[in-house]
C-alpha cells in the first residue's frame, strides 16, 4: 500500500509552475485548479496531498514533518539552513543573490561596510569568507532604497532581471549565490517513505530533463 505523501507548495507564481511539473510527472490533483480559497488538496488514488504555504515557510513545514517534501528557494535554504535533505534542483525560479551598490561608487576599504538585506545569515557568511567587517541592516522590503537614501553602502538581494536595480541607479558588483527552486524532504519521512519519495523525485527529474531537452532544440 502506498503511503500518502504531503507536499508543501509555495503560494504564488512559482508554486503554480511547480504544481504543473508535479502534474506532468503524473501526480495531478484536479481540484487544485478550481478557483477556491482552499489550502489543502488531495488525490487519494495517487497518494498525494498538496498544501499551499507562504514560500518562506516551506522549509519549516518540511523540517518539522508537517510536510514530507516541499519546494523551497535555495535562498531560503541558505538563509535558514533547515535540517532537511535537498533532493533535486527544479531548474525553475532561477535568479542570483547579488551585491549591488550605487553606480560609480568607489570600493569602501577604510571602514565597516554597511549592508542592507533581507538575508542576514547569507550576507554574514559571504563577508566572513572575504574577512570583511560589516554592519548588517536587516530590512524587510524595498531593499534597493537603502543605498539611494544613504542608509547603506551596498545591498545583498535577489536579482532576477536587474530592472529594479537599473531604475534606482544601482549596479551588481558581486554574485553571492545562484538561486533556484529545490525539492527538499523531511529526514524521517525520507526514511519511512523512501520508495514513494524516490518515485516522485525520479518522475520530476525525468520531467525536468525532458523540458531541458525540448528547450535545447
Task: Tell where the protein language model's regions lie, with residue ranges.
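Domain-level signature for soluble enzymes in the chorismate/prephenate branch of the shikimate pathway
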Residues: 1-217
